[in-house]
Amino acid sequence: MNKVVVGLSGGVDSSVAAAVLHHQGYEVIGLTLWLMKGKGQCCSEGMVDAAFICEQLGIPHHIVDSRDVFQANIVNYLVSGYEAGITPLPCSQCNRAVKFGPMLNYARQELGCDRIATGHYARIRYDEISQRYQLLRAIDRNKDQSYFLYDLSQEMLAGTVFPLGDQTKEDTRRIAAEFDLKTASKPESQDLCLIEAHGSMKTFLDQYIHQKEGDIVDLEGKVLGKHQGIHHYTIGQRKGLGVAAPEPLYVVKLDPIMNQVIVANRANAGRSDCTVTRLNWVSIAAPSTPIRVETQIRYRSSAVPVDLIPLEDNRVKLVFDEPEFGITPGQAAVFYDGEILLGGGIIEL
């Protein structure tokens, strides 16, 4: 019998992934990561629901204490990033360093299993020509989570199954109801678990970063107002600036040295290019010459065509056809060829 370890968060997606694989005849083992210290009530509730699902399906359930790993790789990563004036993307970092890698290691070393599954909406296939595992967008483009998975290694992809990649969210809800799973009507969770646990990113960050008043200035350096800490802002932000102006203003830069938030009108808020570093090439080998790709710079943004120009030190330059709004240092730029995720990295300016 095929054995698979399913990462269970206590939500409907991972519950259905486990139920479907169990129904297909797999020997399923549930695995839940205990991620957050202190106020992480979403995780404690999730662990209870995950345990209930495993009992309902009649499968074993393991809980792994990953709080120190999460603190080192995600909490500290976020805090240091916001202090430096960037807006880190914790989910891709978490998937590689906290979830998929450690889960695979635990499955192999403790459970004698070389495959894991999760409830992510994405697809994996092996390409015989390139001899690489390719990562593809989910059939349900509205739920596609491939953007957050760009940093997975070939080894991780080889050992991972995404049972939900070929179905819609509506299919998932229907299947959950058919199996009478406790999580069938559970509300959708936040994309970022830290926000769910703490109420807002501001509340979370204020526990770690001292609020330091500084100036909000325009592109010429004119002081327009005051802020209570640059970590409260992100590139492209319009609401909550507290600045009176004849036209809407947007955050275009955060300067940790001068402790300034720089703002501009929409016409001056776009950029024609950016640099991307810490690249991970997934479905293709790293290109040595410029290529044409579609690039997604935020999870909910549309992919836009760009010229990708390889640079030294595992970096590329992206040149946009038109100035792009909201290019944010610390976020991921993920490259696609249609439905195939080619690779991605972290945005620099």
Swiss-Prot record:
The active site is at C94 (nucleophile), C193 (cysteine persulfide intermediate). It catalyses: S-sulfanyl-L-cysteinyl-[protein] + uridine(34) in tRNA + AH2 + ATP = 2-thiouridine(34) in tRNA + L-cysteinyl-[protein] + A + AMP + diphosphate + H(+). The keyword Transmembrane does not apply. The lineage of its organism: Bacteria, Bacillati, Cyanobacteriota, Cyanophyceae, Oscillatoriophycideae. It holds the Pfam family tRNA_Me_trans_M. It is an enzyme of class 2 (transferase). GO terms for molecular function: ATP binding; tRNA binding; tRNA-uridine 2-sulfurtransferase activity. The record marks H120, Q331 as: Interaction with tRNA. GO terms for biological process: tRNA wobble position uridine thiolation. Residues 143-145, 298-299 are annotated as: Interaction with tRNA. The gene is mnmA. It comes from the Bacteria. Disulfide bonds join C94-C193. Catalyzes the 2-thiolation of uridine at the wobble position (U34) of tRNA, leading to the formation of s(2)U34. InterPro entries: MnmA-like, MnmA-like_C, MnmA-like_central, MnmA-like_central_sf, Rossmann-like_a/b/a_fold. The keyword Cytoplasm applies. SUPFAM superfamilies: Adenine nucleotide alpha hydrolases-like. Its EC number is 2.8.1.13. This is tRNA-specific 2-thiouridylase MnmA. Keywords: ATP-binding, Cytoplasm, Disulfide bond, Nucleotide-binding, RNA-binding, Transferase, tRNA processing, tRNA-binding. It comes from Rippkaea orientalis (strain PCC 8801 / RF-1) (Cyanothece sp. (strain PCC 8801)). ATP binds at G7, L8, S9, G10, G11, V12, D13, S14, L33, G119.
